[in-house]
Amino acid sequence: MATTYLQLSNELLRELNEVELTSANFGDSVGIQTHVKDIVNRSYLDMVNEEPQWPFLATGESGATDPMYGNTYIETVAGTRWYELKTAASSIKDDYGYVDWDNFLLTTVGVSGESAPYTVRNLRYTSIETWKDYFRGGQNKDDADQATGGTPSRVIKSPDNRKFGLSPIPDQVYRIWFYAYDLPTELSAHGDAIVFPDLYVPVLINRARYYLHQFKDNAQNAAFAMEDYKRGLRTMKLHLMDPTPNYFKDDRIRFS
């Protein structure tokens, strides 16, 4: 079971020799108890904001609903170019925290009425500047005529970062798969659990100790805690972000 907001707060309160909180009085904390809760949240957000592509922030599991590439998808509409990345989001604060623009895939697998042979294609990311200079004029002239569309080969990002566009304009329904990562949220209730494995709880605690020592004007201990935090964070990144060897790739064949 993942470590909770209450457990993290009490671990720090014990170190300070202060009265611990309970699930019953967690919302009625005062003084140093409230300060510790604030520090836990600040440290937690420091950690999860360190890397927008932490595996535990993924919006879904790859292949959970379909063996295709990606962890979420949008279905296109014939004759429509632009689509919200997160359809249920009402503003940017509810959008995805990160989208991997190098991993968009188009397919007809799973589309109602489609059968083999299916269309499957990688979508090349094209900057909005390149698209508007070389493609927008001609394609927008035909925007109202879906017959002039086709199977998209490029994906573009809207200037406000909230939508993706397809070029050429889709001529039918396709599924567009991609990898998305959620924005982290603050801990609030006593039972709220951290999103990362308990193995890395000491990293969060060291970050919280840094803030506590700063609060008490203990610069030396704050520096020690910061070094412990940085060391733990490097290990965390090594285990969760860099488990595979580095390599160079050539996209000339991939998108041909």
What are these regions (language model features)?
Residues 1-256:
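Glycine-enriched, solvent-exposed interface loops adjoining structured elements
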